[in-house]
């Protein structure tokens, strides 16, 4: 049995201690057959030509891309975005929705906005 110790340090990551109001938005997506049939190089080109330029237009958003498909049947990928600007986030979502990302290459399963350790903020 594990002996639980009281928390003596903050669970908030050091890079967020200065701004506890950073939104962490998890976007669960399922790859469509269109995406799965593309070669890896063409997938990279799509991100380089569509997704990355959108992020460059909104530097308030940082994005990471995870691949849980070996562990989950619900989502092929999880996009984790961080921002303090929900207007920038809404713009980014609208732009993705108007591109081949949304519904053509990926089915957006869920969007989960969160705060890190919100109960302590």
Each predicted region: which residue ranges?
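A short, structured active-site edge motif that brings together acidic residues
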Residues: 105-113
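Short S/T/G/P-rich N-terminal loop/turn motif that feeds into the first structured element of a domain
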Residues: 1-75, 84-91, 112-121
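Conserved, mostly hydrophobic/aromatic
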Residues: 79
């Amino acid at each position: 049995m594990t002996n639980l110790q009281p928390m003596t340090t903050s669970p908030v990551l050091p890079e967020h201690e200065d701004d506890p109001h950073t939104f962490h938005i998890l976007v669960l997506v399922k790859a469509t057959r269109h995406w799965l049939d593309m070669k890896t190089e063409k997938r990279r080109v799509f991100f380089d030509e569509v997704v990355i330029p959108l992020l460059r237009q909104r530097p308030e958003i940082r994005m990471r891309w995870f691949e849980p498909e070996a562990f989950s049947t619900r989502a092929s990928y999880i996009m984790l975005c961080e921002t303090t600007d929900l207007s920038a986030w809404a713009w980014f979502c609208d732009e993705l929705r108007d591109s081949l990302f949304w519904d053509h290459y990926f089915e957006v399963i869920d969007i989960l906005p969160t705060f890190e350790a919100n109960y302590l903020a």
